[in-house]
Amino acid sequence: MGRRRVEIKRIENKSSRQVTFCKRRNGLMEKARQLSILCGSSVALFIVSSTGKLYNSSSGDSMAKIISRFKIQQADDPETLDLEDKTQDYLSHKELLEIVQRKIEEAKGDNVSIESLISMEEQLKSALSVIRARKTELLMELVKNLQDKEKLLKEKNKVLASEVGKLKKILETGDERAVMSPENSSGHSPPETLPLLK
């Protein structure tokens, strides 16, 4: 009995997804190394995880040399530029989304190859990873700002509490002096002593 074919779809369980990613990433890198040795080819491999972490590996030639060859070929054939190369000069997410939307509209045609769709899917995943990383960065900055404000408010409250304590002591000391003063004991001057009768 042959092995059951595993359906290729997104793994919902986060832990299982991470384990599968690590295993398949290592397997892919090993396959790339074997391809380089068996066929004498140069292989460069870039992998971006769902958390935005980049992994890369090269076999045959160095990564820099392979990338240099890639850039030369891209310059000779501009039509092969992928979405990332086309959008590297765009600064806003709005412009990026507009380009993605246009690509999706183009993909509705019948002349789009499966390779183009797969490439576009990978570009969208990369864009989402960048956006998620930026979102996390902004949230961390917001949390830090809130923590700084909380710390500042606590320090101000501490200073105010100290000032209130000092005022209370001053008021209490003033009341004690007023009570001990002879003129304030009954509200009148002390009575004069009558002379003794001779």
UniProtKB/Swiss-Prot annotation:
Residues 80-173 form the K-box domain. The keyword Nucleus applies. InterPro entries: MADS-box/MEF2_TF, TF_Kbox, TF_MADSbox, TF_MADSbox_sf. One of its GO terms (cellular component) is nucleus. PANTHER family: SERUM RESPONSE FACTOR HOMOLOG (PTHR48019). Transcription factor involved in the negative regulation of flowering time in short days, probably through the photoperiodic and vernalization pathways. Prevents premature flowering, particularly in the cv. Landsberg erecta background. In non-inductive photoperiods (e.g. short days), required for flowering through VIL2-mediated maintenance of the epigenetically repressed state of MAF5 via H3K9me2 and plant homeodomain / polycomb repressive complex 2 (PHD-PRC2)-dependent H3K27me3. This is Protein MADS AFFECTING FLOWERING 5. It comes from Arabidopsis thaliana. The gene is MAF5.
